[in-house]
């Protein structure tokens, strides 16, 4: 049995904020003042659920084993107008490049792209008012208090779309992993058979004057990948966040122009807005052909596209390639349209593992509060049925 990969780029989790604490119906009790006025405090706020970007995470693996995220409830109000303690917030640490969607509708919720960026996913319920709040000139001994707001809950899908400056695009065995290993310190698996790369790999390319950029090796694309063939849709989404696409086609390919057309068509079929991204074409394995043949090939290539002839094994053309990539990355118009990532998620295209069929966690409350699911926070109150706690007359 193959070992389970540590690269997890999607996960489905259940999240719930804390509900607000109920207000207190307490009445003042002091020596020589057996029947004082109301002094019940407000309930505490329920805990919020936040998302926070963390550059120390590279995958969503840590969430695969912690998929019920629940903040704690606010505490009830107390005597002497004391407010109940707020519920403890839950912060979900995610890698930069994580997009979050509603698991039921596919609606885009938010996008975490920077280290330290924090977004509230679910808001905790407000605490209910104690009976002190309801005291008026005509009602000086209210025997009721307000319950807290109910918790919010949501099933969400998190997808990691790797943040990289340059994404390597090509058919299996195009030499993408070899190029990444030569230009960076990354050590991807390299072998002479298709689909050697089964998960994305990142590496940092050192450039002149201590400058650098991030390169991502995406698993090979085949014709029909946009329909789920090969490794299909799972890894095409990582291309969405690459600022520049480097198409890699071997020099011994029968028809380079046709292969480039197929690759471009698959990307556009997956997401039409990928056509807006800047592209560079690298003809790989050029150590297998002579310069005269290279010039003949150049005449057959698509026009209006930067083309570089390279050989990662023989380290030919690599400096020219880095110059070309940096030049394209430096252009002011190189920006990713927000709509590429922020469009709704097509839930029908997802194939979840059996373990991803989550059910909401059972809710165990510390206190018995009925009817909280249907309350109108602004109107509903709870009466104190214990008449002994209230004064007969003030």
UniProtKB/Swiss-Prot annotation:
GO annotation, cellular component aspect: cytoplasm
Native source organism of the sequence: Porphyromonas gingivalis (strain ATCC BAA-308 / W83)
Gene for this chain: obg
Name recorded for this polypeptide: GTPase Obg
Domain OBG-type G: 164-330
Region (Disordered): 26-45
Family from the record: Belongs to the TRAFAC class OBG-HflX-like GTPase superfamily. OBG GTPase family.
Domain of life: Bacteria
Keyword Thylakoid in annotation: no
Class of enzymatic activity (EC top level): hydrolase
EC number per UniProt: 3.6.5.-
Cofactor(s) listed: Mg(2+)
């Amino acid at each position: 049995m193959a070992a389970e990969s540590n690269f997890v780029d999607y996960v489905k989790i259940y999240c719930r904020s804390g509900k607000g604490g109920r207000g207190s119906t307490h009445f003042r009790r002091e020596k020589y003042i057996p029947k004082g006025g109301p002094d019940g405090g407000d309930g505490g706020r329920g805990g919020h659920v936040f998302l926070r970007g963390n550059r120390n995470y590279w995958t969503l693996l840590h969430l695969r084993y912690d998929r019920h995220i629940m903040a704690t409830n606010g505490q009830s109000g107390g005597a002497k107008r004391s407010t109940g303690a707020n519920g403890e917030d839950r912060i979900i640490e995610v890698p930069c490049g994580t997009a979050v969607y509603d698991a039921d509708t596919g609606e885009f919720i938010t996008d975490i792209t920077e280290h330290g960026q924090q977004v509230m996913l679910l808001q905790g319920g407000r605490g209910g008012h104690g009976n002190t709040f309801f005291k008026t000139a005509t009602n000086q001994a209210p025997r009721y208090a307000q319950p807290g707001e109910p918790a919010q809950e949501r099933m969400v899908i998190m997808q990691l779309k790797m943040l990289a400056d340059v994404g390597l695009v090509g058919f299996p065995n195009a030499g993408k992993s070899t190029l990444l290993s030569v230009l960076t310190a990354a050590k991807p698996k390299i072998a002479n058979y298709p689909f050697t790369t089964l998960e994305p790999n990142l590496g940092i390319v050192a450039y002149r004057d201590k400058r650098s950029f991030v390169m991502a090796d995406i698993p090979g694309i085949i014709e029909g990948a946009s329909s789920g063939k090969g490794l299909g849709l799972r890894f095409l989404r990582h291309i969405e966040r690459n600022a520049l696409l480097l198409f890699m086609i071997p020099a011994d390919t029968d028809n380079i122009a046709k292969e480039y057309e197929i690759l471009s068509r698959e990307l556009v079929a997956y997401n039409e807005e990928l056509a807006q991204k800047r592209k560079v074409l690298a003809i790989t394995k050029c150590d297998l052909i002579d310069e005269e043949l290279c010039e003949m090939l150049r005449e057959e290539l698509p026009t209006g596209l930067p083309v570089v002839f390279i050989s990662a094994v023989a380290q030919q053309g690599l400096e020219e390639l880095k110059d070309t990539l940096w030049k394209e990355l430096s252009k002011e118009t190189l920006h990713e349209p927000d709509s590429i990532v922020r469009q709704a998620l097509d839930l029908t295209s997802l194939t979840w593992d059996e373990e991803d069929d989550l059910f909401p966690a059972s809710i165990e409350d510390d206190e018995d509060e009925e009817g909280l699911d249907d309350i109108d926070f602004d109107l509903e109150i709870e009466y104190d049925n214990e008449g002994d706690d209230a004064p007969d007359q003030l």
